[in-house]
């Protein structure tokens, strides 16, 4: 019998993880409040809400691995708490101790302001916003209750269909703070990282998911504007509650993951040239 993996929350990132798991020949279950009509037929969908424990009754009992990667469905603290703090508790109660690996997809929002310095998994956390505080609370609870759980703290995702930034640049509406360092990872590399950590023997408790090229926002936006043949972005304030930092991916790469898109500008260029954004 094929090993079974549950994707708890299965949006754009989850679907890309699912494709990799299916290619391994695994049995893939995906939990979502409203399963999509267009998705790989081999995915076994579960219509449920992580914030509603009653909806999780009857989950399959033979799940071997879990990737927890939902979208919050809103930018308010109550929804974040329901999905990221309460959700793992509900899911663990529903599944029991059977899964031998959990990967919790978190965010670099758990870090505070670092003045553009390099950070890694051992850098102290000091989240500035409610999202980072609640994600950190969820990480700590999960690792206290599942000592083998693995946390993946992702940088900002970009990739096909994620065109908001490029659209703002085209329209001359983007603003960039000089000297404010930002980090990116292609969504396909993020999916590869989740798949990798689901199967990595003896993983460490935490990994940062970012590419090799953190850049100040004004330099990144300026380079993207040139690729788009758009006007350079005007100066603007730093993003609210997003500290300036450079994320080190050394631990993730040392574990054996090879990034397809280590340079975000090369990744953006490919998307623009292929008309995918």
What are the residue ranges of the model-derived segments?
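Conserved Rossmann-fold cofactor-binding substructure of NAD(P)-dependent oxidoreductases
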Residues: 43-64
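NAD(P)-cofactor binding segment of oxidoreductase domains
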Residues: 59-103, 137
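C-terminal amphipathic/interface module of NAD(P)-dependent oxidoreductases
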Residues: 240-277
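Substrate-positioning beta->alpha
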Residues: 157, 164-167, 176-198
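Mid/C-terminal beta-alpha module of Rossmann-like enzyme folds, strongest
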Residues: 191-243
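N-terminal Rossmann-fold NAD(P) dinucleotide-binding loop
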Residues: 14-15
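Conserved Rossmann-fold NAD(P)-dependent oxidoreductase catalytic core, especially the SDR/UDP-sugar
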Residues: 89-128
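Catalytic helix-loop patch of NAD(P)-dependent Rossmann-fold dehydrogenases
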Residues: 115-151
